[in-house]
Swiss-Prot record:
The gene is ghrB. NCBIfam families: PRK15409.1 (NF011938). Transmembrane segments: none annotated. Its EC number is 1.1.1.79, 1.1.1.81. It comes from the Bacteria. It is found in: Cytoplasm. It comes from Shigella dysenteriae serotype 1 (strain Sd197). InterPro entries: D-isomer_2-hydroxyacid_DH, D-isomer_2_OHA_DH_cat_dom, D-isomer_DH_CS, D-isomer_DH_NAD-bd, Glyo/OHPyrv_Rdtase_B, NAD(P)-bd_dom_sf. Its main location: cytoplasm. Catalyzes the NADPH-dependent reduction of glyoxylate and hydroxypyruvate into glycolate and glycerate, respectively. This is Glyoxylate/hydroxypyruvate reductase B. One of its GO terms (molecular function) is glyoxylate reductase (NADPH) activity. It is an enzyme of class 1 (oxidoreductase). PROSITE patterns: D_2_HYDROXYACID_DH_2, D_2_HYDROXYACID_DH_3.
Amino acid sequence: MKPSVILYKALPDDLLQRLQEHFTVHQVANLSPQTVDQNAAIFAEAEGLLGSNENVDAALLEKMPRLRATSTISVGYDNFDVDALTARKILLMHTPTVLTETVADTLMALVLSTARRVVEVAERVKAGEWTASIGPDWYGTDVYHKTLGIVGMGRIGMALAQRAHFGFNMPILYNARRHHKEAEERFNARYCDLDTLLQESDFVCLILPLTDETYHLFGAEQFAKMKSSAIFINAGRGPVVDENALIAALQKGEIHAAGLDVFEQEPLSVDSPLLSMANVVAVPHIGSATHETRYGMAACAVDNLIDALQGKVEKNCVNPHVAD
């Protein structure tokens, strides 16, 4: 008899078929308490869980006594109670490598669109404001040769550094938990403390996961240390930034502009002051949102769940010691 798994995110037909070759698959719309209660027997028997964008906490795990592995279609896993999973010896799998290049593309797009005011001036053209040769009020700022500060030099940070160094000849500063020898050798990146990075960078790109240590890492103090001409980019996790402090910094002119793919609350409220600022490019968490990458992430998550329930945790496992 095949193990039972719960799928709470739609999959392409071929990936669903692959999953069904190994498991009895039960599909649900979400992991809300109502859904769990309505499908209590299914959740009680499930050994695997696969999906994204839902919270997996201790309360849910209490309803799933046979759960052995959960696989998320994402690299981030701050919506999972890792301690609760680990205490119950439940493996947590994620997709850390599939989306690297695509997210780096998004970061570079935010750098370019904020610096050159692409969204703002495109909207002005559509509104009929382009009636003569443009003047300084339409101008942006250069990207090439400007200093890029990267906070978080992981896979995505490295991919961004590659684009900035080879494509735009940008000097690169970085701050991370440790020195990154490859970044220093390949891109001539310079490690520095966060204060130095903030004071010297023309673009500050934040690429950090959400943890207890990174929550509100960026606040009023950090924005005050940045150049008034600096542009802030965040494509990591929204709550790493105190959004009210960011709004205040933009309103006071402490920083020049912001390109944001993530927010403290998602979806972003239609009442957010960020949406009324011409110098803010706000996109709806599209970091990995291409057809190719989202398919690759889903395929990786399917393979991860198959591997996990077969006891193979050599890669893509957040808590591999659970299998010991």
